[in-house]
Amino acid sequence: MKLFGFGSRRGQTAQGSIDHVYTGSGYRIRDSELQKIHRAAVKGDAAEVERCLARRSGDLDALDKQHRTALHLACTSGHVQVVTLLVNRKCQIDVCDKENRTPLIQAVHCQEEACAVILLEHGANPNLKDIYGNTALHYAVYSESTSLAEKLLSHGAHIEALDKDNNTPLLFAIICKKEKMVEFLLKKKASSHAVDRLRRSALMLAVYYDSPGIVNILLKQNIDVFAQDMCGRDAEDYAISHHLTKIQQQILEHKKKILKKEKSDVGSSDESAVSIFHELRVDSLPASDDKDLNVATKQCVPEKVSEPLPGSSHEKGNRIVNGQGEGPPAKHPSLKPSTEVEDPAVKGAVQRKNVQTLRAEQALPVASEEEQERHERSEKKQPQVKEGNNTNKSEKIQLSENICDSTSSAAAGRLTQQRKIGKTYPQQFPKKLKEEHDRCTLKQENEEKTNVNMLYKKNREELERKEKQYKKEVEAKQLEPTVQSLEMKSKTARNTPNWDFHNHEEMKGLMDENCILKADIAILRQEICTMKNDNLEKENKYLKDIKIVKETNAALEKYIKLNEEMITETAFRYQQELNDLKAENTRLNAELLKEKESKKRLEADIESYQSRLAAAISKHSESVKTERNLKLALERTRDVSVQVEMSSAISKVKAENEFLTEQLSETQIKFNALKDKFRKTRDSLRKKSLALETVQNDLSQTQQQTQEMKEMYQNAEAKVNNSTGKWNCVEERICHLQRENAWLVQQLDDVHQKEDHKEIVTNIQRGFIESGKKDLVLEEKSKKLMNECDHLKESLFQYEREKTEGVVSIKEDKYFQTSRKTI
């Protein structure tokens, strides 16, 4: 008998409520919680991290207020350079934060594949779990990153790791509807036989979350279709309860394939049973979620009804009474055997049932009157026994209902307790998913309760039907004395010799009625026997159901114990957190008291400052008044002094004005004289410029003459040189002649020649001296002209300077005149 079931929540998926945090999200970073190295790691500044480590090597594994290291923050932000720097410095790779997450889990969680690969290559442990029981592989499954999952598995990640809900990565991929991850994990030989805490298989979860693609993948993997959960439901039951006809059709086709394979191994006798099973299974799909009551026997044992044979009615009646029908046993047309077989493991159950019914038909004891009387005595006792059995059964059903109610109420209480604490199932993908999970479990428990109520109603209907059958038995027993009285009448009528034709007809009618009544009695007895057999079978079935209920109860008790242990663990953890919070609260209260005292002190200071400020304000107002008075007095004195100064200044200005007017007249006279001088100097300058031009012309002519004289002088020097050479030759000749001729004659000739030559030389020298004198004269003239030119330039410069001074003096005169006019 099934006590629990899941409701018809159709395809509730975790995917809708998961799209929140992992867009990631990472950490909530507050600047006040971080140290310098943590800030540098968040920004990805590897140089700053290196400087922090150079200053203080202890900052390598330093924790912030959330127990996070720089490696955690770098992996969350995806800064590969910082991660490589920290890993090369041999930091702690498997250090955990406040949620017991390692840097590897954080890198996989934030989908930072490069950081995760670096950590795995440096020996990070991929099998560590956070406080929610999730490993890095669970987070890779959630983010649907096959490359990350493959790297985790290649570095030794456990493919069958369990979270706190006993979900393996494969089951978690099915819950999140990650079809690619399911295919990937199955290729990596993940176990398709894994079950969660409620003993639900992968196929059941795929059906529950309405994933036909995943169902098809699992069926291709030859998953066990007949596996049952804690409540005895299989995958097809989930499809029926959620009204998923497509998935149900897939599962039925897969079952047919399995049964076809088994048909080849089983004989021809089993083939008929299997076909009956499939016809009944398809035709009579259960309306509720109760699978254990699907094996509901609606069969009745065929009754023996003797067909009337040719002969006397008396013989017919005796034969019917003795139960010796000569014809073949005829089954009641309205009572046909119908059996619903649910579990394919119970193959051939239909045949065994048919054999049992045939044996029951053959073993009906209706042989003699003694046997009938013995049977009647047992039947008289039977209603009481039946009523006792019915009461026991109803008590058992009521007990099972109470157990179910208590378990469901206990589960609901536990869930409300957990909600009061703040968490239900603490798997964070994210909190909304857990809330959905809790709502799902509560709804499932409510539906289980409704299923138990439906089961109880069905059992009550069966009991009412049995009561009606017992009433029929009582009516049959009430008819037996009338039949016996009729038989006695017929015997007496036979014994009396004086009976007439009318009595004979009456007896004949009575015999016919007697035969009919006996036939009815035989039918009723057969029904009673069949009901007894049915009741025995049902008792056995109910005993089995009670055993199943006990087993489920034991399993539920274990589950409750596990939940209680988990609750105690969570309560202990929450107690520790509460103690920490209390300590922090006391610390904060102490700080608050200190702040209050400081606030009081500050208030007293503020009051004193306010009094001082009021005094200062009054003083300030008085000082302002005095300052105004002083300003007024100062302004008055200033006005007086200004008036005095103005009067003195005006007198001075007047005197200066008179003096300036005198100077102006003098300057005008000087200006006129300068004008005359300017005109005269201009005329003289013109004359001098003309003389300068003539001098320049003369100078150029003299220069030409000097050049010509130089050329002539050079020619004369050349001639003198030639003459001196000739003279030397002449002297040599004279000497030679003197030697040859007479010294005296030669001497006279030589003297005459010398005198002639001397005159020529003296003439040349005189000419040269005269030309030199002329050159000197010309140079003196040029010097004089240059001096005159310089003098003229100086006079021009003085004239221009005097001119500018005169312009300035004119402007000053104009200014003084304008100032006089204004005054």
Swiss-Prot record:
ANK repeats lie at residues 66-95, 99-128, 132-161, 165-194, 198-227. Residues 372-384 have a biased composition (Basic and acidic residues). Residues 431-480, 565-724, 776-805 form a coiled coil. The keyword Coiled coil applies. Residues 301-343, 355-402 are annotated as: Disordered. One of its GO terms (cellular component) is plasma membrane. InterPro entries: Ankyrin_repeat_domain (IPR050657), Ankyrin_rpt (IPR002110), Ankyrin_rpt-contain_sf (IPR036770), CC144C-like_CC_dom (IPR039497). It holds the Pfam family CCDC144C. SUPFAM superfamilies: Ankyrin repeat. Keywords: ANK repeat, Coiled coil, Repeat. It comes from the Eukaryota. This is Ankyrin repeat domain-containing protein 20A1. It comes from Homo sapiens.
